[in-house]
Amino acid sequence: MTKAIATIVLLIATIINISCDNSTIYNKYINADTRGWGKNEVMEYTIDSIAQTGTYNLTLGLRINNTYPFQNLNMLISQTIYPKNITYTDTITCRVTDRQGKMNGYGVTLYQYSMPAATMEYTKGDSIKVRVIHNMKREVLPGIVDI
């Protein structure tokens, strides 16, 4: 009986170790203004130096509360790679709610969203500056807590 339990525990531990992904090189949220995210409020993130040449996935995370008034959130994301001084820009749309107004994110009063933004090749020593702005018609978006 104890041998069977030990085998199950070992199997679960192995699965957990295999599924863990330790490749995150940068993770940061910036708080939006308490009134909401302003159209001219640029969220800027700087990655000082890439340690290893390779392919990296850029993922954008959001935290939104239930006062956000729209179904979607459109954002412009640009990343400048130094020392090459090359800038890539893309538009990302986050589907915040379904058609009935139910939040699609994870959470109870604060909803978490995670969206793939880009897959990029970086060279060892590159530094990256990522800028995110919202691309909605409304000047200030209430309900946006962190980006």
Give residue ranges: language-model regions:
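C-terminal motif of bacterial Sec signal peptides marking the signal peptidase cleavage site
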Residues: 16-19
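Bacterial signal peptide processing site
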Residues: 21-24
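Post-signal peptide N-terminal segment of mature Sec-exported envelope proteins
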Residues: 28-48
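Post-signal-peptide N-terminal segment of Sec-exported extracytoplasmic proteins
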Residues: 41-70
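Noncatalytic modules at the cell exterior or secretory-pathway interfaces
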Residues: 52-60, 120-137
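Short acidic/polar inter-strand loop motif in beta-rich domains
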Residues: 64-67, 112-115, 134-143
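Short coil-to-beta strand junction motifs in C2/discoidin
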Residues: 69-76, 143-146
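An anionic, turn-rich surface loop/hairpin at beta-sheet edges
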Residues: 91-121
